[in-house]
């Protein structure tokens, strides 16, 4: 994946924030090694400021401080940590995270002040949760898929609330989902209310670390509750009977274990992936069905719109590429341009 470009104003803010954090870290006292036991392996199940909850190999969770030399630590990181010893006055000292293992993957999102910010590590797959209520939006699904392709993390599309569909509605939704099945994406139809379709989803989650992405109101948290066998541990984003709007809730990112095997990181930071930091070429690459036609256009600088000799547009006209995907591709590019214009205007004020 090519390196994302930041504007001069954004880069100044990133550098300023980094220097501020360095200054703060130098002012913090170091930790006495005599306060801690032998090094052990663990996984970060949650991060709270300068502390992290680390789960050891035996399943116990330990609240730990973080060495100031560690620049980045997020939920899902595999770490070397040391338990705290009982202090003289009988109070246990917090453990300490000593080092972070190399990540197999990292889930990031653009941040206006800190550049591209990591929010979870060592993710195997992203579960894109959509629903027929409050709205089945293929545009939002396509935005998530572009993010997954750019991050090089495997996606699974899960359509929730199928219990609200009659036969005609189910046929229509299946036709819409065939657009994604036909280009190689896995689609699962489920209901967190009736638990229909949960078994295939459980099988897809077993043995992997997943993260669920979905806008408020699609039943993401209710689905997680059903999979985890919980009732209230994860707050729900239910649909209001009167308004049809999702009731917004947030919690800190945390790793949970599925009873059937596998793990999930629940984070409010993946409700929507921002794409404004990407280049147009990265968006194009994020549409997998475009790949066979890239480089075949008449002009090298083809915008894949009304340009003469555009191989991608011709494939759309021939029915080889879904028209809805092509339209959403241009909607994403247009929304990116609008956001970048606003942010560049803001940068001129710095």
Curated annotation (Swiss-Prot):
Cofactor, how bound (note): Binds 1 zinc ion per subunit.
Annotated transmembrane regions: none
Chain residue ranges for the region called Disordered: 1-33
Species annotation: Escherichia coli (strain K12)
Chief location of this protein within or outside the cell: cytoplasm
Keywords: Cytoplasm, GTP-binding, Hydrolase, Metal-binding, Nucleotide-binding, Ribosome biogenesis, RNA-binding, rRNA-binding, Zinc
Entry-linked CDD domains: YjeQ_EngC
One GO-annotated biological process of the protein: ribosomal small subunit biogenesis
Keyword Zinc tagged: yes
Chain intervals for the UniProt region annotation (Necessary for GMP-PNP-dependent association with the 30S ribosomal subunit): 1-20
Any one of the GO CC terms: cytosol
Limits of the CP-type G domain: 104-273
Disruption phenotype: Reduced growth rate, reduced 70S ribosomes, accumulation of 17S rRNA (the precursor of 16S rRNA). Ribosomal proteins uS2 and bS21 not found in 30S subunits, decreased uS3 and RbfA in 30S subunits, distortion of rRNA helix 44 near the decoding center. The phenotype is partially suppressed by overexpression of a number of genes involved in ribosome function, including infB, era and ksgA. Double rbfA-rsgA deletion mutants have the same phenotype as single mutants.
Protein name: Small ribosomal subunit biogenesis GTPase RsgA
Domain comment (free text): Has 3 domains; an N-terminal OB-like domain (about residues 1-100), a central, circularly permutated GTPase module (residues 104-270) and the C-terminal zinc-finger domain (residues 280 to 350). The C-terminal domain has 2 regions; the zinc-binding domain (residues 287-319) is required for binding to 30S ribosomes while the extreme C-terminus (residues 320-350) helps remove RbfA from the mature 30S subunit.
Pfam families: RsgA_GTPase
Compositionally biased spans, kind Polar residues: 1-17
Family from the record: Belongs to the TRAFAC class YlqF/YawG GTPase family. RsgA subfamily.
Top-rank EC class of the record's enzyme: hydrolase
Region entry Required for binding to mature and immature 30S ribosomes, spans: 287-319
Region of interest called Required to remove RbfA from mature 30S ribosomes, as start-end residue ranges on this chain: 320-350
EC number: 3.6.1.-
Localization terms from the record: Cytoplasm
Amino acids binding Zn(2+): 297, 302, 304, 310
Entries under SUPFAM superfamilies matching the protein: P-loop containing nucleoside triphosphate hydrolases
Lineage: Bacteria, Pseudomonadati, Pseudomonadota, Gammaproteobacteria, Enterobacterales
